[in-house]
Amino acid sequence: MGEETGRRDCILMSDRNVARFFALVRNNDFLDNPPLRPKVAFCRLVAGATVACYERLTVCGAPSMLHAYSGWIELWEIAVPFASEILAHHITSTRFEDLPASAIEHAKIFILDSLGVGISASTADGARELLEASSRWGSGQDALVWGTGRRVPATTAALINAFQIHCQEFDCVHEAAVLHPMATLLPAAMAFAERRSGVSGRDLLTAVAVGVDVSTTLGVASKSPLTFFRPATSGGFGAAAGVARLAGLSTEQIVSVFGIQYAQTSGTMQPHVEGSVVLPMQVGFNARAALESCDLAAAGIPGPRDTFEGPFGFLRLCEGEWDLAPGLAKLGREWQISQVSHKPFPSGRAGNGLIEGLMLFGSELPFPKSEIESALVIGPPLINRLCARPDRPAPNGNYARLCAAFIGAKVLQHDRIGLEHYRDVELTDSRTHELAKLFSMQVDDNLDPNALVPHELIIRSKSGQEWRWRCEAMLASPSRRLSREKHLEKFRTCCGFSAQPMNAGAVEKLIVAVDELEAVQDVRELIALMT
């Protein structure tokens, strides 16, 4: 391109990037602190791109000229930054004082929630085997494996604790991004904090806020159905962001962190389809990689720069159709930790509406459960894709948590569903599998590949009666928040499943410590309460 025009600084500019450029340069907050390469750039417009012939913009208080002619845009004083640079700048420039009260409150809520869920999974399927296997990967006592009393190298702790947070489908979720942002982020951040003393509660809260922003910005950018497992892939970038913030890395170093993390990014939907225990392990692999990526960048290893949007970048290869502009425009304005939802029930989020509807049916009981002929869920393609799998007579827990028929049958039996219903003889209960035959799912006409709502539950009786319930917003989502009482009840219940028993006093002290996290001088105080 340089030979064609006589210009040296030339880059292809798609419709999407043209639009994103204009969105960025009109964002005054962004321009106050531009993480840009200040030079003249000459950007080729690819076929179909359009732009006004002339605009006068103000960049950092100085007028800047932008011309479009003969299929080229001439940008003076400002060039379109890579998304990795924008995200890295957000990480390094955010201070605890920048966080609104709501972001701090929700960061505390989901830190406590994630600790509880992680502790409970110390007795879940696969946890013991993973801990045993990890003993062959090197020795060290950097960090705690939650709920066990065992100490291991920091990278191993990040892997195992991330597995434990996600392996029971009880961890918090960002519905719009279709990912579980804390599952990778908190274990990596806590492992780093244990390895390096002096990480304060304020540091942790800030790291959580920016880490969730990074993973969810990537998640909401996707306009395609899941193929790679986003809680692991995008979640890994969020974990890397959080650790980089705690490590005090520079903007340039964090750009490298993203590139190095991408080189290690892994996780597909195949284990989800099969109900394999490897599904949550993928979350762990990326949490471990986050620590390694930050260590490598801190040691001076440079990574690729155009990690997300490049010709072989993450979004292009792993997400298909995408648009980063809306998410990037929200950085520093709308904190995504405040958009995270609780999991009130231990199942895939796509099954939580079914559970709520069945519990409501049980409380109203318009006709006896013994008279139910069928129970149909009609909803967006995503919930069918995630939970419309056939029941099996002896499923493992990972399969059962993502099987609407199994989930629904358990709720009909017990008017609730808990962690215990995915363990031992509960998985092979013949009555459960008989009731599972009542359930089916049907796709509606929703065109959004990432939508979970609305969906409808229709229960029909043998005599022709019909009961309907429609879910417009998931229980415990931002518009239907879980009460503090229910939040703490969930945490206390989770602690009761710990492999190493926790006394009630320690549980209550941990609640208080997280409530007062901004006053904690070293977050290892939280770990001390878990041992």
Q: In which residue ranges do the predicted regions lie?
A:
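Amphipathic alpha-helical interface segments
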Residues: L185-P187, A191, R230-L246, S256-P326
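A cross-taxon signal for low-complexity, glycine/charged-rich
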Residues: E3-C10, S14-A19, V25-R26, P34-P38, ...
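Short, Lys/Arg-enriched N-terminal segments with co-localized hydrophobic residues
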Residues: C60-A79
